[in-house]
Curated annotation (Swiss-Prot):
Residues 627-638 are annotated as: Essential for interaction with EXOC1. Residues 141-217 are extracellular. GO terms for molecular function: amino acid:sodium symporter activity; glycine transmembrane transporter activity; glycine:sodium symporter activity. It comes from Rattus norvegicus. This is Sodium- and chloride-dependent glycine transporter 1. It catalyses: glycine(out) + chloride(out) + 2 Na(+)(out) = glycine(in) + chloride(in) + 2 Na(+)(in). Glycans are attached at residues 169, 172, 182, 188. The modification Phosphoserine is found at residues 605, 630. Keywords: Amino-acid transport, Cell membrane, Glycoprotein, Membrane, Neurotransmitter transport, Phosphoprotein, Symport, Transmembrane, Transmembrane helix, Transport. Belongs to the sodium:neurotransmitter symporter (SNF) (TC 2.A.22) family. SLC6A9 subfamily. Its main location: membrane. It is a multi-pass membrane protein.
Length: 638
């Protein structure tokens, strides 16, 4: 995507992303903190964007929507919606050096968008860590000579269990071996029954109840693993981005090592090529279906983490002149390339399993928890040294989940700290992190009950679905049309040394909002009542799901009304104008960067359409302002 940057205004070397050593201290936010280096930010953002959905959702969508033909609408949506929205959120957070609440000094009436992002991140953070805890449980269960879901001779198995491997049918009692010959008859028989991996998942790990309202007992092994996962997340964030930035060197890179190991092992198996061809073979007639384009747009939108608040938060710890345009392109492409790569890993193993059973790949393909905890583990039992491959697979899932969970927790903590906005809360940030982690653990306990998986899927389907689309659409409109696209383009030029490329300007103003609106319409049209296997959710549960979805969106009009009521003005129109006008403390956080219309003055700047924070002309001071409007001035330590 070669697009000219346009005319470059007067800029220093640091404005192009390279901060010279003598200017490094001047570009650091000593009060709030920055990333140790830019690699930490890129790796953290990759870990945030590349999550479980890349492994268990994209490959399934690809083969269901035309195989290789799905790649065409997928990458079209990446270019015209994914990367532009990613760049917008990164530049938004980096320019203001504030989290998802503080950035709305740009237009205080829309601060409800930030609260909506917090609500979404809260929901996702609660259930996402439960998925990680289940991966921990499977990881620990894999530390054995024989995987516990390989056979049907366990206490929890039922007479309906029928597995590919069975100790009673082995020809060699000293070593587990696969049944010889064409196993299609066995698989057809199994279709009428249940696999050992499914019974292990449903009857042993979950002890699944019959109804979402029947919580039964809390599964203590899962509760323990949930505690482990929250402790790991807290320890990695104990010093904020300073500590998590070091952890991501491992958590963001090692999954690629595991993916590569599994890929090499997978493609050497008999039947792997068939699985990969099933994944990639294009069905070009599919691209004429609106559903395929809708799935492509939705997958791009959700997999990049747009409108969660995490991108704004992570970028807020960048140095002011960091080249976030470059970063957004790199991270977005890495995320999508990982999805495609994961598809090879998944379908090579599933192809091997289908070949072993003598059935079509579609009979063993699945997505979501069904892929991660039933289908793929079942396939791994067919491999020699299966516990080793199982350990690697679930360790990869744990790391992928943690990378996203770090940013979800940091989003909430940063929003709280920025909102209070005083030195005391900055000093107590570790305790804020601990408090949020403990609250997340307590709220996740019901999801470890016997009905927990029902609630987890309910939250996944409703809490972070169409609400994200609404939030993102309103964010685009408020920045481009309320604050003004010219103002925002000037802000980016001031920060990067060049304005956003013309392509991005067009996408932000017209193309991306249109695509977002299309996703919203598609989501509504394609809505189907949620089910889990053959279980139909009752109406009251679906109603709770819609309430969760609305709880984030409703923050936007409620806060807008609140802001209108507290804003001065003789008429409603005057109040509306004042409530949408940038606050006096909007702009770069550091005094050194407040140039042009943000330069410290003792009088308003009416020609720019909004006022800037007055600063004492004789003494360098940094405005320390809570996003609730309270402010104080602190002597600059720079």
């Amino acid at each position: 995507m070669a697009v000219a940057h346009g005319p470059v205004a007067t800029s220093s070397p640091e404005q192009n992303g390279a901060v010279p050593s003598e200017a490094t201290k001047k570009d650091q936010n000593l009060t709030r903190g920055n990333w140790g280096n830019q690699i930490e930010f890129v790796l953290t953002s990759v870990g945030y964007a590349v999550g479980l959905g890349n492994v268990w959702r994209f490959p399934y969508l690809c083969y269901r929507n035309g195989g290789g033909a799905f790649m065409f609408p997928y990458f079209i949506m990446l270019v015209f919606c994914g990367i532009p929205l990613f760049f917008m959120e990164l530049s938004f957070g980096q320019f203001a050096s504030q989290g998802c609440l503080g950035v709305w000094r740009i237009s205080p009436m829309f601060k409800g968008v930030g609260y909506g992002m917090m609500v979404v991140s809260t929901y996702i953070g609660i259930y996402y860590n439960v998925v990680i805890c289940i991966a921990f449980y499977y990881f620990f269960s894999s530390m054995t000579h024989v995987l516990p879901w390989a056979y049907c001779n366990n206490p929890w198995n039922t007479p309906d269990c029928a597995g590919v491997l069975d100790a009673s049918n082995l020809t060699n009692g000293s070593r587990p071996t696969a049944l010889s010959g064409n196993l299609s008859h066995l698989f057809n028989y199994t279709l009428q029954r249940t696999s050992p991996s499914e019974e292990y998942w449903r009857l042993y790990v979950l002890k699944l109840s019959d109804d979402i309202g029947d919580f039964g007992e809390v599964r203590l092994p899962l509760l323990g693993c949930l505690g482990v996962s929250w402790v790991v997340v807290f320890l990695c964030l104990i010093r904020g981005v300073k500590s998590s930035g070091k952890v991501v060197y491992f958590t963001a890179t090692f999954p690629y090592v595991v993916l590569t190991i599994l890929f090499v092992r997978g493609v050497t198996l008999e039947g792997a090529f068939t699985g990969i061809m099933y994944y990639l073979t294009p069905k070009w007639d599919k691209i004429l279906e609106a559903k395929v384009w809708g799935d492509a747009a939705s997958q791009i939108f959700y997999s990049l983490g747009c409108a969660w608040g995490g991108l704004i938060t992570m970028a807020s710890y960048n140095k002011f002149h960091n080249n976030c345009y470059r970063d957004s392109v790199i991270i977005s492409i890495t995320n999508c390339a990982t999805s495609v790569y994961a598809g090879f890993v998944i379908f090579s193993i599933l192809g091997f399993m289908a070949n072993h059973l003598g059935v079509d790949v579609s009979r063993v393909a699945d997505h979501g928890p069904g892929l991660a905890f039933v289908a793929y583990p079942e396939a791994l039992t067919l491999l020699p040294i299966s516990p080793l491959w199982s350990l690697l697979f679930f360790f990869m899932l744990i790391l992928l989940g943690l990378g996203t969970q770090f940013c979800l927790l940091e989003t909430l903590v940063t929003a709280i700290v920025d909102e209070v906005g005083n030195e005391w809360i900055l000093q107590k940030k570790t305790y804020v992190t601990l408090g949020v982690a403990v609250a997340g653990f307590l709220l996740g306990i019901p999801l470890t009950s016997q009905a927990g998986i029902y609630w987890l899927l309910l939250m996944d389907n409703y809490a972070a679905s169409f609400s994200l689309v609404v939030i993102s659409c309103i964010m685009c409109v408020s920045i481009m049309y309320i604050y003004g696209h010219r103002n925002y383009f000037q802000d980016i030029q001031m920060m990067l040394g060049f304005p956003p490329p013309l392509f991005f300007q067009i996408c932000w103003r017209f193309v991306s909002p249109t695509i977002i609106f299309f996703i919203l319409i598609f989501t509504v049209i394609q809505y189907r009542p949620i089910t889990y296997n053959h279980y139909q959710y009752p109406g009251w549960a679906v109603a709770i799901g819609f309430l969760m979805a609305l709880s984030s969106v409703i923050c936007i009009p409620l806060y807008a009304l609140f802001q209108l009521c507290r804003t001065d003005g003789d008429t409603l129109l005057q109040r509306l104008k004042n409530a949408t006008k940038p606050s006096r403390d909007w702009g770069p956080a550091l005094l050194e960067h407040r140039t042009g219309r943000y330069a410290p003055t003792t009088t308003p700047s009416p020609e720019d359409g909004f006022e800037v924070q007055p600063l004492h002309p004789d003494k360098a001071q940094i405005p320390i302002v809570g996003s609730n409007g309270s402010s104080r001035l602190q002597d600059s330590r720079i």
